[in-house]
Every structure is written in C-alpha cells, then in structure tokens.
From Swiss-Prot:
PANTHER family: 50S RIBOSOMAL PROTEIN L9. NCBIfam families: L9. This is Large ribosomal subunit protein bL9. One of its GO terms (molecular function) is rRNA binding. Keywords: Ribonucleoprotein, Ribosomal protein, RNA-binding, rRNA-binding. The gene is rplI. GO terms for cellular component: ribonucleoprotein complex; ribosome. Belongs to the bacterial ribosomal protein bL9 family. Pfam families: Ribosomal_L9_C (PF03948), Ribosomal_L9_N (PF01281).
Length: 150
C-alpha cells in the first residue's frame, strides 16, 4: 500500500515522502497514529501543491535575506551607539544583540531578529566593531557598529 508520511518514521520514511509499505503496517499503525495517510491521487496532488508553496516561500525568504544583506553592506549602514565609559575604557552598560536589533530598526528601518545576530558575548568596548549575522541558511552578512563615549 502506498502512503504519504505526515511525520518522520524512523527506518521507514521522512515527512512528505510517498512510499510503499505493507498494508497491515499502514492500516494498523501508520494511519491509526496519524503518521501517514493513504496515497490517493487527490492526496498526492495536495502534497505537490504544498511542496510548491513551501518552495515559493523559501525563495521569498532567500530574496528578502539578500536584500537585507545588500542594505547591511552599504557603507552608510553604520549603527551608532553612545555609551558611558568607565576609567578602564569599558562601557558601563553592555550592548547585546537585542539592542543592536532595535537600533538597526530605529536608525535604518531594517527589521532583523536578534537571534540572527551572532554575538558570542555582549560588547563592552568602544570603537568600530563588525558583527556577523546569519540572515538565511545560505546567506551571511556583517553589521558595522560604531560605539562612542557619551
């Protein structure tokens, strides 16, 4: 019996795959536990439609990520911060990925989730700093920060 897997089943198939399995296994286990459904023509066409829409959504995300990367690479895109600095040259407050994301949105209108900003630890120094950003699984960018003494 041909089935369409609705979830990953170890040793049998991954979500979205169409495979042949024994009738008893399909009816008594996979279909009962909603791990798969029977592969009728209608169900297969439905699956193809879903896959096309997912591909289209991925392409849109990729295009959006490329556009953000182009904006970030412009020389005018320099995120400005002014922080109070102690006698040792370190800032009193630290600059986190959340702060960077908010300033990027406020100064340039670029909306970027703080989870995309790859910051090992909060920044506590002044000067010009470049921070890597993971915009998409295939696209990386760099945010340039200018931290000045207030």
């Amino acid at each position: 019996m041909k089935v369409i897997f609705l979830a990953d089943v170890k040793g049998k198939g991954k979500r979205g795959e169409v495979k042949e399995v024994s009738t008893g296994y399909a009816q008594n286990f996979l279909i009962k536990k909603n791990l798969a459904k029977e592969a009728t023509k209608q169900a297969i066409n439905e699956l193809k439609g879903k896959q096309k829409s997912e591909e289209k959504a991925q392409a849109e995300l990729l295009a959006e990520a490329k556009a953000v990367k182009v904006k970030l690479e412009q020389e005018s895109t320099l995120v400005q911060f002014s922080e109070k600095v102690g006698p040792d040259g370190r800032t009193f407050g630290s600059i986190t990925s959340k702060k960077i994301s908010e300033e990027l949105n406020k100064q340039f209108g670029i909306k970027l989730d703080k989870r995309y900003i790859k910051l090992d630890h909060p920044i506590r120094t002044i000067g010009l700093i470049e921070i890597p950003v993971k915009l998409h699984k295939d696209i990386d960018g760099i945010i340039k920060l200018q931290i000045k003494e207030a």
